[in-house]
Amino acid sequence: MPESADPRDRLIVALDLPDVAAAERLVARIGDAATFYKIGYRLAYAGGLDFAARLAREGKKTFLDLKLHDIGNTVEEGVRSASALGATFLTVHAYPQTMRAAVRGRGPGLKILAVTVLTSYDDADAAEAGYALPVADLVAQRASQAAAIGIDGIVCAAAEAGAVRGRIGPSGLIVTPGIRPAGAEAGDQKRVMTPGQARAAGIDHVVVGRPITGAGDPRAVARTIVAEMENV
């Protein structure tokens, strides 16, 4: 399991907010309690990519959760553009052609993460989508493919971390959304753990959104999460 020099890097704050102004306010309130921020579709379509570039220039780390999946050339060029923004992580869907294209487009400093199965999915959802395998087996299969292709890490639920680690080895990254501090509501995530449980399960980075973005004191919540992971 790769170790970060700064324990704050283990926490990725999900900026699932409506606009850049709201994201700026939250980042300011969190201050030095967090160093790593995730930008997904909602904010990306509202000026979030320029904001990500600005965060990178200010020394923050950024995770562009764009889940790319298209023809190879489009993915490859899209990854190059993300790299030019100074992003640290970028997600693609874990389809072999997509992953190979992403690896071709990857620049220095950018790590590609493959999304195996959304953490909001359970076995019933996977079956409805037409997959014959249960979620755990599908995650393991895709993790093996990703490792063989040269992907840097895997996005998966904490419950699958052990199986994924066995497929990608000790140097691969495991990034887990659906993390909720003790007592927080699960929201739309179906497979969740606390930060401490996730760290004990071998997770490298945890993604936390609403428990921080909706908190009265987001800085304090971020500090508590980092401390919980440090003490594991």
Curated annotation (Swiss-Prot):
Keywords: Decarboxylase, Lyase, Pyrimidine biosynthesis. It is an enzyme of class 4 (lyase). Belongs to the OMP decarboxylase family. Type 1 subfamily. The keyword Nuclease does not apply. Pfam families: OMPdecase. Catalyzes the decarboxylation of orotidine 5'-monophosphate (OMP) to uridine 5'-monophosphate (UMP). Pathway: Pyrimidine metabolism; UMP biosynthesis via de novo pathway; UMP from orotate: step 2/2. One of its GO terms (cellular component) is cytosol. One of its GO terms (molecular function) is orotidine-5'-phosphate decarboxylase activity. This is Orotidine 5'-phosphate decarboxylase. One of its GO terms (biological process) is 'de novo' UMP biosynthetic process. It catalyses: orotidine 5'-phosphate + H(+) = UMP + CO2. The active site is at residue 67. Substrate binds at residues 16, 38, 65-74, 119, 180, 189, 209-210. InterPro entries: Aldolase_TIM, OMPdecase, OMPdecase_AS, OMPdecase_bac, OMPdeCOase_dom, RibuloseP-bd_barrel. Its EC number is 4.1.1.23.
